Each structure stands twice: as C-alpha cells, then as structure tokens.
Curated annotation (Swiss-Prot):
Source lineage: Bacteria, Pseudomonadati, Pseudomonadota, Gammaproteobacteria, Lysobacterales
Organism of this sequence: Xanthomonas campestris pv. campestris (strain ATCC 33913 / DSM 3586 / NCPPB 528 / LMG 568 / P 25)
GO cellular component, one term: cytosolic large ribosomal subunit
UniProt function note: Forms part of the ribosomal stalk which helps the ribosome interact with GTP-bound translation factors. Is thus essential for accurate translation.
Protein name as catalogued: Large ribosomal subunit protein bL12
Listed Pfam families: Ribosomal_L12 (PF00542), Ribosomal_L12_N (PF16320)
SUPFAM superfamilies associated with the record: ClpS-like, Ribosomal protein L7/12, oligomerisation (N-terminal) domain
MF (Gene Ontology): mRNA binding; structural constituent of ribosome
Amino acid sequence: MSLTNEQIVDAIAEKSLMEVMELVKAIEEKFGVSAAAPVAAAAAGPAAVVEEQTEFTVVLTSPGANKVAAIKAVRGVTGLGLKEAKDLTEAGGILKEGVSKDEAEKIKKEMTEAGATVEVK
C-alpha cells in the first residue's frame, strides 16, 4: 500500500519546523540532491547592469543572552507557535525570506532589541 501525494503533504504539514528541516536533510542525503535553489551563471557581457537587491532574507544567527525575549520576538516576526519559535531560536536559521529592505531592517531592529543577533542577506 503506497501513500498518495496528498497523504504525504498532510503528514508533512503536521510536523514541526525542526522535524521538516531534518526530513529535508535526510532526503538530500538519501538522494544526493540539494534543496538550495540552482544558481544561474550570469552572462559575462561588457554592459552588465548591476541590479539593486530588492528581496532580502533575515537569518537568526544567535538568540543572545535573553532567550525568552528572543523567542517572543521570533513568534512576533514569524507567527509561529511557541514550540516552533523555541526550536527556531535555539537552532538558528531563516526568519523571513523575500522581504523588502524596509521590512528586513524592521525585523533586524526588533530582534536586536530582544538581544538576538540577526543577519540580513
């Protein structure tokens, strides 16, 4: 008896963020693939135009000394539940992807005020 795609998606939806991250890592190792988006090689031309980055990723690098404040800030930024926010705070990782520069700076300020260290990429 094999599972349908819908059953697999439902099972994944019930998992916590940390469990899903572990699942992705296991799939990468099992099948020898990477979940990272492929990087397209830029055409080397004399008139290469450098575009300003419009989408940013905010990454939590350290929760700082006050973990409780950092967890509260992570919950406020991501909308995650308490357990998922705690797991993300302890493990570090991506808080938000594809946000504007203003939004990224706002998140960075909020997290820094909570004592956490974040990086905007």
